[in-house]
């Protein structure tokens, strides 16, 4: 669904494109019937603008807390799919909740 506008994004010369959040993964699969990882990779091939994501605490996939290994895998998959910038925040300012996925993304090139 986003691929038809990829050329417009490329021509707009944005500084960065915010790509994905947990709810977008759910909506992409449940309502649009698309593979969100495939969509990121296809857009990465068409758009040279840096991609970024903002993750909320240790809730990478939804609004429930995820185990550390899931958050680390999430960071790895984001980087391998073409995400260059990963930001994270925690509503309680408990940054231990954000460190695993950030370190994983950094280790894999984001």
What function would you assign to each model-found segment?
Residues 2-9:
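Short catalytic helix/loop segments, enriched in acidic residues and glycine
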Residues 10-14:
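Feature activates predominantly on carbohydrate-active enzymes
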Residues 16, 20-110:
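Active-site beta->alpha loop and helix N-cap motifs at the rims of alpha/beta catalytic domains
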């Amino acid at each position: 669904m986003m691929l038809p506008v990829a050329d417009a994004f490329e021509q707009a010369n944005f500084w960065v494109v915010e790509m994905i959040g947990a709810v977008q993964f759910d909506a992409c699969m449940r309502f649009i019937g698309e593979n969100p990882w495939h969509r990121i990779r296809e857009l990465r091939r068409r758009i040279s603008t840096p991609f970024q994501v903002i993750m909320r605490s240790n809730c990478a996939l939804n609004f429930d807390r995820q185990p550390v290994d899931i958050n680390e895998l999430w960071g790895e998959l984001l980087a391998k799919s073409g995400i260059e910038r990963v930001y994270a925040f925690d509503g309680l300012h408990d940054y231990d909740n954000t460190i695993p996925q950030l370190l994983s993304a950094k280790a894999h090139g984001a």
